[in-house]
Amino acid sequence: KRALRNNYHKNAEWFGTFHNQELKGDVGYEKGVIRRDPTMVIQVDGLYYAWYTKSTGKTYGFGTGDPEKKVFPWDKSEIWYATSEDGWEWKEKGLAVTFGPKGEYDDRSVFTPEIFVHKGTYYLVYQCIKAPYLNRSFITIGMSIADKPEGPWERLEAPILEAAKDGKWLGEEDS
């Protein structure tokens, strides 16, 4: 109702037309592997780059009570990247960002990345989950920084954004 009241449906910036196209290369469908949430595609020195959430294994949901079971497709995931010379055929290059150390804000899962580039420095921002993940947790936003798109990526020791524990927004706009 709020979106209709605020006329978001009349704002062209919120809507676009998408066309599905089968991926070529080694990042397409693979049984038992989940690849989702790709970043914007950037081009560096004639090569295209994209980062994405990657996870393997069966998803069980919250009902098991086992803290080691994967509860969502993006649970126990990492951030990987792929490159392309033409933007159509992609080659998976490898891991970009993995979980943080045990007990840290990102020790369970890192997912839904986005890439930013500023003055020759590369910034990956992404959602993070801290274990245990038996019920909806407060998700944080982490960041890793690199001097080149291939990495190595240096993880920040603390999240750049955390949810308020009381569930209240700081302002009234769209709340």
Please tell me what each predicted stretch does.
Residues K1-S175:
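Carbohydrate-active catalytic/glycan-binding domains of CAZyme proteins
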